UniProtKB/Swiss-Prot annotation:
GO terms for biological process: alkane catabolic process. It comes from Alcanivorax borkumensis (strain ATCC 700651 / DSM 11573 / NCIMB 13689 / SK2). Pathway: Hydrocarbon metabolism; alkane degradation. Fe cation binds at residues 6, 9, 39, 42. Keywords: Cytoplasm, Electron transport, Iron, Metal-binding, Transport. Disulfide bonds: none annotated. Coiled coil: none annotated. This is Rubredoxin-1. The keyword NAD does not apply. It is found in: Cytoplasm. Its cofactor is Fe(3+). GO terms for molecular function: electron transfer activity; iron ion binding. Involved in the hydrocarbon hydroxylating system, which transfers electrons from NADH to rubredoxin reductase and then through rubredoxin to alkane 1 monooxygenase. Binds 1 Fe(3+) ion per subunit.
Length: 54
């Protein structure tokens, strides 16, 4: 599982954890997150996220 970081605000999407409050189940790969999903902290789209090694 990978982690993706918002380059604008630093929010981390962790594939292992998902975002259950937003309907994204734990274990959901980044490419399976809906294309219209936006960062819950700053509102930018998936194009503004980069994979990170933590």
């Amino acid at each position: 599982m990978k982690k993706w970081e918002c380059v604008v605000c630093g929010f981390i999407y962790d594939e292992a954890e998902g975002l259950p409050d937003e309907g994204i189940e734990p274990g959901t790969a980044w490419n399976n997150v809906p294309e219209d999903w936006v960062c819950p902290d700053c509102g930018v789209g998936k194009d503004d996220f980069e994979m990170v090694e933590i």
